[in-house]
Amino acid sequence: MEMLAAIRERKSIRAFLRKPVPREVIAEILEASRWAPSGSNRQPWQVTVATGETCRALAERLVARCYERQPGSPGTGSAPADVDSRVAALRADLEGIAARMGKSLWEFVVAGSFRLYDAPVVVVVSNPSGRGGDVAPFVTTMLLAAHNLGLGTCWLGYPLAEGALIREMLAIPEEERVRAVVALGYPDPDSPANTYRSPRNEIASFVRWIGFD
């Protein structure tokens, strides 16, 4: 797949087929991801990949915590007006998709995130260095590589609140901080959850050109 097409076409996948992902395919994704940039070439990432019963058990524990703690739905905080308008639009779109699936927005997005959207694989990126920002290019590269190989991903924010539980269940060293949680698998083409692609602003709305004709 041509690179720019992969960037434009990639989207968050929230429903997966019950189809195992071969280890060699995941290794190919991570082989590409390791070339991501990092400050001073520190490469400050450790990756834990779980599937099978371990992945299912983690999802069960996470969603149990979710129902105990009842975190808020997206868009319930405060942000600048332009950001709030985008979040409100996203929320409305996702509410419509959730309704088609017979779920509330909270069940679909919040509980779904903690459930890892029933993905067959979870990828956890951690590091001990405190350089959390350097993980973002690695994860972004991973998402694009997965899309290129026909897999879907969802970069999950909600499970980060349960970093200690994730470390415990996946035997991640205590000195490492969980920086990213990614659901990975083959997209379910028949699910309404995967029909949506959130829009993006045109570059004229956020780019300043200096010194060009």
Language-model features and meaning:
Residues 1-213:
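Acidic, surface-exposed loops and disordered segments
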